[in-house]
Amino acid sequence: MYSFEQAITQLFQQLSLSIPDTIEPVIGVKVGEFACHITEHPVGQILMFTLPSLDNNNEKETLLSHNIFSQDILKPILSWDEVGGHPVLWNRQPLNNLDNNSLYTQLEMLVQGAERLQTSSLISPPRSFS
């Protein structure tokens, strides 16, 4: 089983970033235009999240269509924070499930999800069935 510090060290090595001298409880990584945050929450889970900036024309129903079930446990989930009502895109995985590529894949899927959300105004809402 990896520790949070070992997981962050491995991810930074894969991203060719300098490893911080002190690994804080929440680590930030900039990927393209997205600030991605990584923490251990709850204990034993690697949580990654970003705060996507969404166009005001996006309706929550359309955005929530991205939350459809998936076989991939790393697929990001869109939520709204309780305090400010801002969108939060997040995913997580158990520390004991990590392998050499799973953190990189988790970060990649988070960024891809954020990119899709920014273009969601081009996506029509799901059809309703009667």
UniProtKB/Swiss-Prot annotation:
Gene3D superfamilies: 3.30.1460.10
Protein name as it appears in the record: YopE regulator
One GO term (biological process): protein secretion by the type III secretion system
UniProt keyword annotation of Cell wall biogenesis/degradation present: no
Family matches, as InterPro entries: T3SS_chp_SycE, Tir_chaperone
Chain's role: Positive regulator of YopE.
Domain of life, per lineage: Bacteria
A Pfam family per the record: CesT
Signal peptide: none
Keywords attached to this entry: Activator, Plasmid, Transcription, Transcription regulation, Virulence
